[in-house]
Amino acid sequence: MAPMGIRLSPLGVAVFCLLGLGVLYHLYSGFLAGRFSLFGMGGEPGGGAAGPGAAADGGTVDLREMLAVSVLAAVRGGDEVRRVRESNVLHEKSKGKTREGADDKMTSGDVLSNRKMFYLLKTAFPNVQINTEEHVDATDQEVILWDRKIPEDILKEIATPQEVPAESVTVWIDPLDATQEYTEDLRKYVTTMVCVAVNGKPVLGVIHKPFSEYTAWAMVDGGSNVKARTSYNEKTPRIVVSRSHSGMVKQVALQTFGNQTTIIPAGGAGYKVLALLDVPDKSQEKADLYIHVTYIKKWDICAGNAILKALGGHMTTLSGEEISYTGSDGIEGGLLASVRVDHQALVRKLPDLEKTGHK
């Protein structure tokens, strides 16, 4: 008796072959997709899997998580800043000239801090826009993971999720504020900063002092770990200003507020904002106002603006205009920062200061 077999018609053979090809195509395309995802092809620097709270289409992000990562980024960047300074090998160079004609300095501290801060934030939140002072080398990517834990001090202040669309978020990083002072070993002025703006408005700020390891953070309509002082003198104020143009501000300040006005020359915008607050750092000077009269970059001021705003304070141009943290990376109109005083009255008192800064 002949062995039993299965006969297929030519049509059956064709269907069988098509099914087989379909299975092979599905397996192969899935393999390629996995490989592309693994290597971050088609994504941002530091790509890969979407971070917490970030869907494939952009989705939403929780500002509490962004605050947690921002604090960690500022501290990690600060570790690099401190390590380089203590090694005394800064590899200092100039990126060019500032508008005032001074060298715009950069060191290994700037570069290494920037790398840590950028890739930590980018790995955690790949769908948000990140602006940073230093260039990010796309050929030197690093995946720096976050454990997705929100610290208890943040949860205590901000108990519920604060979701916003990822596409509305812009992050501003200053990996080393006060580079000039850093090269002079004036350590107290140095900070690392992260700011999160939503639709151009500063809502979250972190200022970290690497050499004293003090960190201030705040979220607008959320909470903070820093507070304003109990009183400020707006009649004869102590005014903190840039070391590079203290004389320019002093002349106008004395005319406006009188001879009892004190001018405090200082480095770094982060340090100057902290001078307005109740900071438990013995090296931190105290001021009533912060005035700046020349061009300044947004990564220098965004974190401080968010913190002041969260505490009921103000940071505006010298003419009283709010600062938008979208578009260009700098502002032309000078700067006035205050807390617990009549800010608009101060603006009206300083009508000529902006003109002085643009001679």
From Swiss-Prot:
The active site is at 110 (proton acceptor), 179 (proton acceptor). Its EC number is 3.1.3.7. It is found in: Golgi apparatus; Golgi apparatus, trans-Golgi network membrane. Residues 1-12 are cytoplasmic. Mg(2+) 2 binds at residues 174, 177, 300. Strongly inhibited by lithium. GO terms for biological process: chondrocyte development; embryonic digit morphogenesis; endochondral ossification; phosphatidylinositol phosphate biosynthetic process; post-embryonic development; skeletal system development. It comes from Sus scrofa. This is Golgi-resident adenosine 3',5'-bisphosphate 3'-phosphatase. It holds the Pfam family Inositol_P. Exhibits 3'-nucleotidase activity toward adenosine 3',5'-bisphosphate (PAP), namely hydrolyzes adenosine 3',5'-bisphosphate into adenosine 5'-monophosphate (AMP) and a phosphate. May play a role in the formation of skeletal elements derived through endochondral ossification, possibly by clearing adenosine 3',5'-bisphosphate produced by Golgi sulfotransferases during glycosaminoglycan sulfation. Has no activity toward 3'-phosphoadenosine 5'-phosphosulfate (PAPS) or inositol phosphate (IP) substrates including I(1)P, I(1,4)P2, I(1,3,4)P3, I(1,4,5)P3 and I(1,3,4,5)P4. Pathway: Sulfur metabolism. It is an enzyme of class 3 (hydrolase). Keywords: Acetylation, Glycoprotein, Golgi apparatus, Hydrolase, Magnesium, Membrane, Metal-binding, Signal-anchor, Transmembrane, Transmembrane helix. GO terms for molecular function: 3'(2'),5'-bisphosphate nucleotidase activity; 3',5'-nucleotide bisphosphate phosphatase activity; 3'-nucleotidase activity; metal ion binding.
